[in-house]
């Protein structure tokens, strides 16, 4: 995004950095919650846990959708701006990046399917407890941010506009020095 040097791609890159911090932070929290219960991060150790942890499964799916850039959630805004702003300058690289977005979506959905769907595949998962009040109160603000930014991207864009313009002008200045 930033390397394309265009205003739209730079603005998208800044927004994507913010969104990645929110979404990746939420995913790490969620993985940590599960690790505290089972003391493993091995995907094959799970299966069917949405039966015992339905709130956790719903929040993990929502966060996964935000991570892969589903429209209406925060991950879409920056990714779309980056791809649109970069395409004119770097058609092949932008196409490869768009393919990477598709691969990331496939992986996230594959992981979700293995961990959450189907019957419970490990007896240790039968006694897993769903999110407690502390965990719920710590993850919900991030979930609300993902939704808010996805629905009202202009709000976060209003904070980014000036910086994106400054970076665009700086890049243009350095192009003129050559």
Model-assigned labels for residue ranges:
Residues 1-129:
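Functional transmembrane alpha-helices
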Residues 53-55, 108-178:
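Cytoplasmic/organellar membrane-interface segments at the starts of transmembrane helices
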